[in-house]
Amino acid sequence: MSLITIINPLTYIVPILIAVAFLTLTERKILGYMQLRKGPNITGPYGLLQPIADGLKLFIKEPVRPLNTSPILLILSPVLALTMAMLIWTPIPMPYTLANLNLGFLSILAISSMAVNSILWAGWASNSKYALIGSLRAVAQTISYEVTLGIILLSILILTGGFTMQLLTATQKHIWLLATSWPLMMMWFISTLAETNRAPFDLTEGESELVSGFNVEYAGGPFALFFLAEYANIISMNLLTCILFINPGPTQHPELFLINLITKTMILTLTFLWIRASYPRFRYDQLMHLLWKQFLPLTMALCLLHVSLLISISGLPPLT
């Protein structure tokens, strides 16, 4: 094994983890200012060292394991969650991909649906009724919203004519897909909120009824891994939204592409935080009704429109 095979993944993983650490600080600061308070401001200048202090505190704590839990699955679940969250980043161009996959988008969907297993295992291995209910909620919610994500993705890929990220940037050279497919963009964005278990869809962490959800028995290091995975998923989903609908620019200028991509992703991520501060939590039946009775019929109709549009204007997408 050469040194480059170790350095390559590390140069990808370490910046993601640093971004995740400071996203937690940004969230706490934004929520603080929206609630007319300061947020973290003691550790370091303006509280900038808070995520480092939090991370150190969590990882040096003694790992506590309740007596009746399943020890292997209990440790395996957070590790799997973080591994899946990191794997999603491999086909994403920044501006070059870590693995140039032909079916980049399909692999991202497959990996994100595999990440559900870690939540299910965590709830089951904890041997707690609250954790199990939380994990079952998370699984039902994630699997449900993946249906609309898949159909929206299919609609966009029909316009593009291929599964690679590079084709998408070429398709959006003259006009963003946001301008032509804004209903899909709105439904995609709301579905990503549900997919990442964020407010107002954070039913898995319903504090009033489930204490903390599927991670109720976790503390210290394993809890930190779940936390990192959740925020890494938020950033990766927003990156995807940016590539799909708000073209990050041509890949001929790597520096401009990266700056453009990061700026737009930051705006989308701040919107996630703004939504968390503004909206109350959905009821579970409202969450399911929104998907199965509103989003699904609408996305299927729009998918048919995207298919028929190409034929009706006598133009086929660039087939690769």
From Swiss-Prot:
Its EC number is 7.1.1.2. GO terms for cellular component: mitochondrial inner membrane. GO terms for biological process: aerobic respiration. The chain crosses the membrane at residues 3-23, 72-92, 103-123, 147-167, 174-194, 226-246, 255-275, 295-315. The keyword Transmembrane helix applies. GO terms for molecular function: NADH dehydrogenase (ubiquinone) activity. Keywords: Electron transport, Membrane, Mitochondrion, Mitochondrion inner membrane, NAD, Respiratory chain, Translocase, Transmembrane, Transmembrane helix, Transport, Ubiquinone. InterPro entries: NADH_UbQ_OxRdtase_su1/FPO, NADH_UbQ_OxRdtase_su1_CS. It is a multi-pass membrane protein. It is found in: Mitochondrion inner membrane. It catalyses: a ubiquinone + NADH + 5 H(+)(in) = a ubiquinol + NAD(+) + 4 H(+)(out). Belongs to the complex I subunit 1 family. Core subunit of the mitochondrial membrane respiratory chain NADH dehydrogenase (Complex I) that is believed to belong to the minimal assembly required for catalysis. Complex I functions in the transfer of electrons from NADH to the respiratory chain. The immediate electron acceptor for the enzyme is believed to be ubiquinone. This is NADH-ubiquinone oxidoreductase chain 1. It comes from Varanus jobiensis (Peach throat monitor).
